[in-house]
């Protein structure tokens, strides 16, 4: 689980670093693809992690008011907000085909 969380975090840090480097060098850097990769990976990995947590907790994991149940609802909405996973895949695919 920790590796999945770290993978999303590292891609997010990479996209932010590229953006900062572009500002520091005063050259516009497009980080759309990196941001899409980070968002897609982070949200999909978060969904996998929360699914594993639900599996570990069994029936108590879906009980209203528990932390796992709350996280499951939160993660599900994050996968849709700011572009669903399929939209992120289209952005990434378009960039790969253009390069």
Predicted regions and their residues:
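Alpha-helical interface subdomain recognition
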Residues: 1-99
């Amino acid at each position: 689980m920790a590796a999945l969380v770290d993978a999303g975090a590292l891609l997010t840090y990479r996209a932010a670093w590229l953006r900062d480097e572009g500002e520091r060098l005063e050259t516009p850097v497009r980080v759309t693809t990196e941001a899409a990769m980070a968002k897609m990976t982070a949200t999909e990995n978060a969904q996998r992690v929360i699914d594993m947590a639900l599996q570990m907790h069994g029936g108590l994991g879906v009980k209203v008011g528990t932390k796992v149940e709350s996280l499951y609802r939160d993660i599900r909405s994050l996968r849709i907000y700011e572009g669903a996973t399929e939209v992120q895949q289209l952005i990434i695919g378009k960039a790969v085909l253009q390069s």
